[in-house]
Structure formats: C-alpha cells, structure tokens
C-alpha cells in the first residue's frame, strides 16, 4: 500500500508539472482539460483530484492501439467515465467526440451529447461507458482486461 501511495504521489506530481506546461496553444473549441498522463497500476489509474465538471480527455495506449477516455465529476461529486468513441459510428476514423459549448459532439455524424449522460447511456450515438472500474479514494482504476476489450474500437481512429 505504501509503494502504491508513493507511486500515486509521484505520478500526481509528474502530471501536475506536465499540465503546468500546457496551455495557450489549445484549440478554441476544445474547452476541456486534457490529462496527458495517467498512472499505470495493472491498468489505468486516473487521479480523482484532477477531474472537474468539464470533461478530461485521457490518452492511453493498449496493445499498441491509441485510445482515449472521457472523465468528469458531476454536481453530486460522482465520477462519470466513458471511452471517447461513438457507439453508433464505430469503425469510422472520426467516431470520437470533441467538447464545445457544454456538449460533446461526434466528429463523424455531428450528434450532440450532454455531459449528464457520460458513462450512463449505452448504445446509440454516444461515448461508450466504461463497464469495469473501481475507486480507491484517490484514483479511479480501470483494469487492463477492460481496456483490452475495448481497444479494437480505436483501431481506425484518426484523432491522433
């Protein structure tokens, strides 16, 4: 447990330093926070302290496939998680969402999706919910098996 807390603290510091160097040059339409590095602990660990009511875009590589997740904290203090891939447009290189004016917008079909449903609505033109994760107080942990099961949906992705 002590090693895990030290790793969590080190990664949080690295993340804070990385985020401090970001800014100024971001796309105007992309109003959300981008968490560029998350911690690896037999999967992906996302520091809860870094999340806000605006969606964070979390980059991850699984089995050589670049992926991205959305994470935010709602008004009730609950974490909402989803993969940044459109379930209806899956297979399209543009089946991902960008955030603008309080909405997530599918870059393939243009559907607008409200933040209140992130991670809660399955099926349709919306981000795919993360089905297996745990909270350990300081971080949300998504196991490698969960990430590996969804990675194929990102194979044709053109966001990166």
Language model segments and positions:
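Iron-sulfur (Fe-S) cluster-binding segments and ferredoxin-like electron-carrier domains
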Residues: 92-100, 111-120
